UniProtKB/Swiss-Prot annotation:
Biased composition, class Low complexity, residue ranges: 190-213
Source organism (scientific name): Lottia gigantea
Biased composition (Pro residues): 214-226
The protein's name in its UniProt record: Uncharacterized shell protein 13
Keywords, ordered alphabetically: Glycoprotein, Secreted, Signal
Length: 264
C-alpha cells in the first residue's frame, strides 16, 4: 500500500516537471513510457481530460472595458472639432483620430461600431475587411482621411468605398440646413378680390346725361423721393425669391459649413 502511494507521488511529481518543461504532451509521453495507460493523473485532477488546456471562450479576443465604456472616435472628433481653430482643425483632428483608432485597431474588424455609427462604422468595416489594412496601419489611414475631409466631409458605402464629399455638396447642404432652421419673418397678407357693387335693376343700366358725361378724377402721380446717400436699401425676402440672405448668413450652422468649405 505504501509502495503504491510512493509510486503515485513520483509519477505526479514527474508529470508536473514534464508539463512545466514540455507542455501537456510531455506528461502524456511520460505516462506512456511508464506504462500508465489510464491517462495523465494530473489531467484528470484538473479536468483537462478532453484535451483543451483552456475553456473554449477564454482564448477569444475580448474588448477591454475601458474601450467599451469610452465614447466612439466619431463622438470624440465631432466634440473637439468646434473647439479648434479652423485653420489648424483638420491637422489636430487627424492626430487625435489616428491615436484613438490605433487604440481600437485590433477590434475594429469585428466591432466597427467602436469607430462610430453610419459612415464611420462603414469606413472601419471597409478598411479592415475589404481593403485588408493591418491593425497597425488603420490609425494612419483614418488620420489621412480626417486630415483631408474633417469629421463629416466624407461618405462611405461598401461598394464604392470611402470618398470625399464634393465642396459644392457641402455648400448646398449648408444652405438647406440654414433654410430649415430660420424662422419665417414675413407675414403673409391674404389677397381679396375687390368687386364693384352692382344694383339689382333687372339688367338695365340707369340713364345718363349724354351731354354732360360724368368724369372720374385722375390721381396725380407723386414724384419719387430721392434716396439719401448712406441709407441702405433693405431687401425683403420676396425680392430674393423668398430667400432671406441676412438670416442665412447669420445662421451658425451655415457659417460652420462655410468654414469647412473654405478649409477644404
Amino acid at each position: 500500500m505504501m509502495w503504491n502511494y510512493f509510486v503515485t507521488c513520483i509519477v505526479l511529481y514527474a508529470n508536473i516537471i514534464s508539463i512545466h518543461t514540455f507542455g501537456l504532451t510531455g506528461g502524456n509521453n511520460l505516462n506512456q513510457a511508464l506504462g500508465l495507460t489510464g491517462g495523465n493523473p494530473l489531467d484528470s485532477t484538473l479536468g483537462l481530460s478532453a484535451g483543451n488546456a483552456f475553456p473554449s471562450g477564454m482564448g477569444a479576443m475580448q474588448i477591454p472595458a475601458y474601450l467599451r465604456m469610452a465614447p466612439s472616435v466619431e463622438t470624440i472628433c465631432s466634440t473637439q472639432s468646434p473647439l479648434l481653430n479652423p485653420r489648424e482643425r483638420n491637422g489636430l483632428l487627424s492626430d487625435l483620430v489616428g491615436k484613438e483608432i490605433s487604440r481600437r485597431s485590433r477590434f475594429l474588424a469585428a466591432n466597427p461600431s467602436l469607430a462610430g455609427t453610419g459612415k464611420w462604422a462603414c469606413a472601419a468595416n471597409y478598411y479592415s475587411n475589404v481593403m485588408r489594412y493591418r491593425p497597425n496601419e488603420l490609425g494612419n489611414v483614418f488620420g489621412d482621411l480626417i486630415d483631408s475631409t474633417g469629421c463629416d466631409g466624407f461618405t462611405c458605402d461598401m461598394v464604392r468605398g470611402v470618398r470625399k464629399t464634393s465642396p459644392m455638396s457641402n455648400f448646398l447642404n449648408a444652405m438647406m440646413i440654414s433654410q430649415m432652421m430660420q424662422q419665417p419673418n414675413a407675414a403673409q397678407v391674404p389677397t381679396t378680390s375687390q368687386q364693384q357693387p352692382t344694383s339689382n335693376t333687372g339688367g338695365q343700366q340707369p340713364p345718363t346725361n349724354a351731354s354732360n358725361p360724368p368724369t372720374n378724377p385722375q390721381p396725380t402721380p407723386t414724384p419719387a423721393q430721392p434716396t439719401p446717400s448712406g441709407t441702405q436699401v433693405q431687401q425683403t425676402p420676396a425680392a430674393n425669391n423668398g430667400l432671406d440672405l441676412t438670416s442665412m448668413f447669420n445662421n451658425p450652422a451655415f457659417q460652420e459649413q462655410l468654414m469647412r468649405l473654405v478649409s477644404t
